[in-house]
Amino acid sequence: MLRWAAIFFIIAIVAAVFGFTGIASAAAGIAKFLFILFLVVALIMLILGITAGTKITRH
């Protein structure tokens, strides 16, 4: 799960670079949306990875 969180975080950073710097000005709106989407997914995966890890180590 933590690996997926890292992957989605990297995707969010790449989307931010394209969206916020104006490199792809035609796709800036889409890139900003993807940044928010993948950032939220990365945070969810991070939380799930941490909670799943604590459940496994408690037993």
Swiss-Prot record:
Under InterPro entries, the record lists:
DUF1328
Q: Which UniProt keywords apply?
A: Cell membrane, Membrane, Transmembrane, Transmembrane helix
Per the record, the similarity remark reads:
Belongs to the UPF0391 family.
Please identify the protein, giving its name as recorded: UPF0391 membrane protein Geob_0344
Q: Which HAMAP family match?
A: UPF0391 (MF_01361)
TM annotation in the entry: 4-24, 33-53
The protein's organism comes out as Geotalea daltonii (strain DSM 22248 / JCM 15807 / FRC-32)
- Does this UniProt record's set of keywords contain Repressor? no
Main site of residence?
membrane
Where in or outside the cell is it found?
Cell membrane
Q: Which GO terms describe its cellular component?
A: plasma membrane
The annotated topology with respect to the bilayer is: Multi-pass membrane protein
